[in-house]
């Protein structure tokens, strides 16, 4: 450890390489999201565009046919398409969603979806017909509401139609399951507003969003990271989130600035609950619990691992614990583990 600058008001007594876990007071605030989608006026159903045999296929327990043609033809008639609930799921591939498209359905979103069978009977569920092709390709200004999307670990949930940055995407009451990245990309940035969504069972839940707002959502049980922000993934607001049971870090931030996470709960990450490297972040009014549940390396068994950069930490509670069944590793070893040049301002925590 070196050059760690602590500016403190109310702070925890610390030990070498880490800080002990102590409870603090917490003032709860819950952000209330507003409805960002229009009414039903102007929507047309995809059903009349489906061959009757293909409608039966959508409602089977194992759909086999490509239904892309129906959505493509419906989009020629209107930019506002309704996907009615089905007993199975729709199968699409490479459907380009033009600027201004709004797709709407009605879905019950499973907490996790480890198999495509988990979305059967959940309503307006969609999967990819060809495992090598994305379900949709996005242009700017596209909105999805009430859809349960199930992909595969070789493709991302949001693919650019042009190969460049995708902007002004709105997602409400949607589920993203079994993608390489549920929302976002490792190669391009995406500007997106996310409200009341479930992002679960992907390799990475959310990646490289910029100028975005994410609220009232669950980011759960992703293989690696819940949220990963890399170089330049700046200027995001995360609020009222439940980020839990992600295999590595619930929140990973490297070389990114001007990000705020507030009024959220981060629980039972495999490694550090929050990993910060050469980044700037504000953490406000959050609970961090049981971090480092699968790590055998002490510095990774911590609520916050900061490796250079700046963090303002205000009104947080940290708690240790085991798995929900009382078994598993008691973690973490530290509240905060800091190395390299790090500047922390910690208050009321």
What are these regions (language model features)?
Residues 1-20:
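N-terminal secretory signal peptides and thylakoid transit peptides that target proteins
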Residues 25-49:
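C-terminal segment of N-terminal export signals and the immediately downstream linker at the start
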Residues 41, 78, 86-87, 92, ...:
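Surface-exposed or flexible loop/turn and strand-edge residues in extracellular/cell-surface modules
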Residues 46-84, 96:
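Acidic Gly/Asp/Thr-rich repetitive segments characteristic of extracellular carbohydrate-active
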Residues 72-77, 89-104, 110-145, 150-168, ...:
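Extracellular beta-strand-rich solenoid/capping regions of secreted or surface-exposed proteins
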Residues 84, 98, 104-106, 145, ...:
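Feature marks extracellular polysaccharide-active and adherence modules
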Residues 92-93, 108, 112-117, 130-133, ...:
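Short glycine/acidic-rich loop motifs that flank beta-strands on beta-rich extracellular proteins
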Residues 124, 142, 166, 189-190, ...:
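Small-residue (G/S/T/A) turn/hinge positions that recur once per unit in extracellular repeat modules
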